[in-house]
Amino acid sequence: MNFLSHFYFDRNTPNANIVLGTILPDLLKNANKSWNVHPEKHIALFGKSGLNTLLQGWKRHLQVDLLFHSSSFFNNKMQELKRLLIPILKDSPVRPSFLAHIGVELLLDHLLIEHQQININSFYDNLEAVKANDLT
């Protein structure tokens, strides 16, 4: 799932750190593909309240991804899109399965916006509300 789709599940949380935590796994992966961060395996490092709520969001991200990526909806739509992409990407280094995966997620983000299921300003307001000293 992509950023707005993750936000959808926690759009009503009063804690901005949780919202940041729900998108942080994908943000880090986008920043550097070689980073393989697993804070959920080091819970003792997250005793401080701000860090703990960030970790709550991170764990929520993992739970939602596990459910979504194992759903028949996601897998069926990904396969449909992949079939359409295979001939287009035949000479490309981009794997059709990768692009289909991201494509389905971005389409879901688009649909959430189009059907006004999320408030984009609220998403960015939450990110802006995260206090730097909560994260150290």
Please give the residue ranges for each predicted region.
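An N-terminal structural lobe/cap that precedes and organizes the functional/catalytic core
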Residues: M1-F98
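Catalytic cores of phosphodiester-bond-cleaving enzymes
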Residues: I88-T136
